[in-house]
């Protein structure tokens, strides 16, 4: 048994499950494998633009969890195993979309607890992981991540984008999260014109925010 990836390549479950899950959980950072190293130093800085992570002196950008294919349902959230969650990821904490700035665990139960900054209000929220026992002696911990919308960027306008939604509507004035120089990177990619630039958008009761982007090259359009 196996699965087909986005490029139509077949992968065996026996050899590819862990790699596939890592790509799904961190779609824009699957080339990094150092997240299993629990001894790396992480420094979290929170300022007026939002939390920023520095790992080994390198500033890292917002990272998100994006469901793909059949997983991208109409649900507002998607479950994420806790062992794939890192500081800097976006989760739903207390019903709010937040960027994780702290992860702790109970010394007695090893249950994870996450602290994050609300992407829209900048308030702090905390929530513990959901623990289940699908089989005897098997413990699974999960958290909820938001389901993202993918919009095709049509134009760039002073810190916002004009985009074609999944339903075919045109929306203007969608703000870009002011972090990690994201707006400038989107602008550069759009002006280069090497492919169709897609914005990954999070929704909060009608308010929308661009939190990342990807480029779809002509061979995959």
Curated annotation (Swiss-Prot):
It is found in: Cell septum. Its main location: other. GO terms for cellular component: cell septum; Woronin body. Signal peptide: none annotated. GO terms for biological process: positive regulation of translational elongation; translational elongation. InterPro entries: Hex1_S1, IF5A-like, NA-bd_OB-fold, Rib_uL2_dom2, Translation_prot_SH3-like_sf. A motif (Microbody targeting signal) lies at residues 219-221. One of its GO terms (molecular function) is ribosome binding. Major component of Woronin bodies, fungal-specific organelles that occlude septal pores in order to separate intact from damaged compartments. Hex1 binds directly or indirectly to the Woronin body tether that in turn is anchored at the rim of the septal pore. Belongs to the eIF-5A family. Hex1 subfamily. Forms oligomers. Self-assembles into hexagonal rods. This is Woronin body major protein.
């Amino acid at each position: 048994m196996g699965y087909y990836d986005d490029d139509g390549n077949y992968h065996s479950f026996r050899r590819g499950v862990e790699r596939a899950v890592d790509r799904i959980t961190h779609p824009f950072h699957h080339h990094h494998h150092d997240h299993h190293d629990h001894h790396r130093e992480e420094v979290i800085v929170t300022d007026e633009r939002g939390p920023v992570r520095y790992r080994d002196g390198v500033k890292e950008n917002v990272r998100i969890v994006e469901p793909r294919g059949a997983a991208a349902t109409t649900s507002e959230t998607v479950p994420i195993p806790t062992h794939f969650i890192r500081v800097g990821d976006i989760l739903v904490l207390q019903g709010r979309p937040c960027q994780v700035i702290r992860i702790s665990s109970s010394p007695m139960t090893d249950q994870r607890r996450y602290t994050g900054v609300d992407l829209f209000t900048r308030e702090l929220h905390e929530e513990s992981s959901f623990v289940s026992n699908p089989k005897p002696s098997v413990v699974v911990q999960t958290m909820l991540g938001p389901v993202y919308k993918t919009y095709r960027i049509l134009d760039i306008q002073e810190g916002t984008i004009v985009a074609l939604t999944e339903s075919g509507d045109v929306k203007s004035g969608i703000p870009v999260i002011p972090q990690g120089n994201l707006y400038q990177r989107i602008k550069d990619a759009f002006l280069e014109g090497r492919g169709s630039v897609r914005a990954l958008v999070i929704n909060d009761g009608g308010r929308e925010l661009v939190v990342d982007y990807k480029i779809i090259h002509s061979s995959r359009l």
